[in-house]
Structures are given as structure tokens and as C-alpha cells.
């Protein structure tokens, strides 16, 4: 699974997970839904089916509208989103510790 994030490796390679992975990684920026689909490697029609539930659960938030295009990002004020971000950070630290231990073992 080289080139796949730890978040996806842990939770599975599913469209919703790919979208969340992209939104977590890019949480400081906002994107139109078409770019989210493209960057998350999810079919736009699939994302259109997932999106209402993500909005309803408060995982994503509208940041602004530019010329009729609505921009979104992960809702970092949402407790569930906060825990997902925390999980992603934890997975990265665990992986870094594992690599550090492997490098310390003479071999």
C-alpha cells in the first residue's frame, strides 16, 4: 500500500475515508466539492451521494462562496472531526516511533 496514507491503511480504502483523509490533510484550506472529489480520488457522483451526510453530521463546513462556487473544509470545531484529526496524528506518531525503533535495532 505504498503511497497510501496511514489513515486510509488503518480505516480502509473507501470513498468516505479518502474524502476525510484529504480534508484532514488539507484542513487549513478550502475547496469546491469538485476539487475535493478530484484530490481525494473519488468519483464526483459518489461524493455527491456522501456529501449530504457529511454536512448533516457537521464534518464539513462552508467557508465562503466565490462567484457562485461554494468552498468547504473539514469542520475543526466538530468533536467527531477533532477525534478523526487526533486519530490521524496518533497514527503518524505511532508509525514514526515504529520506524525509529526499527532503525535502532542493529541488523
Model-derived features with residue positions:
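Amphipathic alpha-helical dimerization/coiled-coil segments
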Residues: 79-107
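Short coil turns linking two alpha-helices in DNA-binding domains
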Residues: 43-46
